[in-house]
């Protein structure tokens, strides 16, 4: 229901806000504005270590086991059929939290072991993920051509233990071919 309302808002250019996303498109533009609706940095003890796990409502994770667990939020956007898109992200407001040890993602299996292992990303002195915003290939749902636009409003450097939190951003869908 929320996805359908977001689609209609995109198609009819009616201001609508869902999970922090708001359509701000003008003619010949495909823009979404993101405003962080809140999050919690929960402390969790695993393997005798204290980790921080960022949590947001209506968010999923788009990570593999061993990678830093960072929530990702998504929405659908109606697009012209037969076109493909990329996304351009402009961060409008962010903050950096220091001395944070983000919990590694354990597993996609339904049965958890309670043991987490830090993957190779924890050895790198760079922010993860490298791409904060993504757009899917177009899909057809109920006769509408749509793309899924996803944003990870967190970025983590495991070596410096810095967590960047995005409070607001603008995303523009850019036509990248047919």
Predicted regions and their residues:
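Extracellular pro-sequences of secreted precursors
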Residues: 3-178
